Amino acid sequence: MKKLILLILLLGLPSLQAQDYFPAHSEVKTKQEVYKAFTNATLHIDATTTLEKATLLILNDKVVSYGLKVSIPANTITYDLNGAHIYPSFVEVFSDFGVEKPKRVSSSGRSPQYEPTREGFYWNDHIRPDTEAAQLFSYAKKSADDYRKAGVGIVNTHQSDGIARGTGLLVALDDHSDASKRIIDDRSSAYFSFTKSVQSSQSYPGSLMGATALLRQVYHDLDWYSKGNIETKDRALEALQNQRSLPQLFDAGANGNTVRALKIGRQFGVNYSVLGSGDEYNYVRELKQFTTPVIIPLNFPKAYDLSDPVYAEYVSLKDMRHWYQAPSNAKILSEHGIRFAFTTNGLTSLSVLRTNVSKAIERGLSESDALAALTTTPAEILGKQSEIGALKPKMKANFMISSGPIFDVKTTIFEHWVNGHQHVYEDRNTPDVRGEYTLNLNDESFTIAITGTLQKPTVKISKGDEKLTVKSSFSSQWLNLSFSDSLGQLYRIAAKKDNTLLKGRVVYANGNSTAISLTP
C-alpha cells in the first residue's frame, strides 16, 4: 500500500512543478495611461491648417485631439510652449537608412558573363524583387539622430541595388522603442531603377536602352507567368506578383529618364512615383500627362568657381543653367499643377535640408507647398495618409517643436517627438538673443551682430567700418562679451534678453560698471 501511494505521488510531481510556469494573477498590475498636452502652441495640423494658441493632446503614440479649446484629462502632463511651433514630422520616401549595403561582386575574368548565378529566380540577376529590406535592416541610431535634427521623423528605406529592387520598409525614427513599435510597415513599397545590381557580373543590360527593354520584358513575362502558362516556379516573378498592390517607386535618374519611367508604367498599368534628378523643369509638358506625384531631390549644385580660366572652359552652358534653375524646380512644377514630394536622397549632409527648401521658397515656392512636399504628399505616395504626415486624431504622434516657422533659417528645432517619445535638441526656455543691436558707450556707437544657433550664438562687433576682436560666451541665458576699442579701452559686458532688448552691465578696465541696454 505504501509503495502504491509513493508511486502516485511521484507521477503527480511533474504536473505540480508545471504549475509554476504560469504567472500568478497577483503579479498583474494596472498601468495608468498618461496623456500629454502641448498648450499655447502655434499648431500646424497639416500643410494648410494652422491654429494660434492651440493645444495638441496625445496618448502614447497617437494624437487624441487638437484645437483652441481641448478638454484635458486629469492624468495629463502639460507642456506650455509659449507660442513655439508644432509641425508634423517630415516623411522621407526614398532612403537606404539602416539597410545593409549590397556587396559588390568581383569579376571572375575578362570574358563577359551571360548566364544568371541564382537558381530558381529570373533569368537575369539584375531583377531582384525578392529582396526584402526588413530582412536586411538594423536601426542606425546616429543616422536617425541626424534625420530627426533635420526634421525627418519617418523614413521609407530599401536596398538601392538592381533594376527590380524588392520591398521597402517604413520606419519611425524613435530611439526609445524596439522594432515592434518602430516599424510601421515591413512591406511598404516596391522599388525599381534603370541601374544594374552590383551583386552580379551578368553583362546584360549594358545600356539604358537595354535596361528599358529588360524591364518591359519582365512585365510581359510576369503577365504570362501570372496566367499559369509556365509550370516552373520563378521566385523572382512570384515576388513581383505579390508586390503589385504596393506603392511603386522608381529611381529614374537624369536626362528625361523620369518621363521614360512613367511611360513604361503607363504601358503596363503601373503607377510609378518617380525619383528624378532635379531637372524636371525641362519636362513640364510631358509630366503634366501623368497624375502620380514625382519625387524631387534638394541637392542643388554649388556655384562654379570660374576664376580659373582653364577650369571655366570645362563648365558647360547646360551645367551653368542647371545650377541656376535647380532651386526653381519645385516652383515651376507647382505652377503647372504637377504634384511632388521632396527627398533627402542625394544630399551630402542632412543639415542643409531646410536651408535648401528655404532657397526653393525664395524662388517662389509657397511655404504650404513646401511643407506638403515633406509631409502629406510622401505620406500619400506610400498610402499612409491616415497615419502619418499630419496631426489629426488617431494619427501617429510624430512632430517637432520649433522656435519659429520651420523654413526660416533662424528657426531652431527644440525637440522631435516620434511615436510619442521625446528627443531633445535645444532647451525651449533658451531666449533667442540673435539679431543686430546698437550699443552706445562713452559717446561711441558699436554695432553688435549676433548670429549662429540658439545655444551657441556667434558675435561680431564693429565701430563704423572697423571690425573689433571679441570674445563671447552664452550660458544660463546670459551673454558675456569682452572686447577692446581702437584706443585699447577694454569692455566686459554681461547682458540678458528683456523683451526686444539685451539688458545688463558693462565693466570697464578700472573696475567701474554701469547699466546698459543693447537696442535692436
Segment roles from a protein language model:
Residues 464-500:
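Contiguous, well-ordered beta-strand patches that form the walls/edges
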Residues 36-42, 428-447, 456-465, 472, ...:
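Tryptophan-anchored aromatic micro-motifs
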Residues 1-24:
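Bacterial Sec-dependent N-terminal signal peptides
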Residues 24-31, 43-55, 67-68, 351, ...:
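Acidic, glycine-enriched loop/beta-strand segments at the rims
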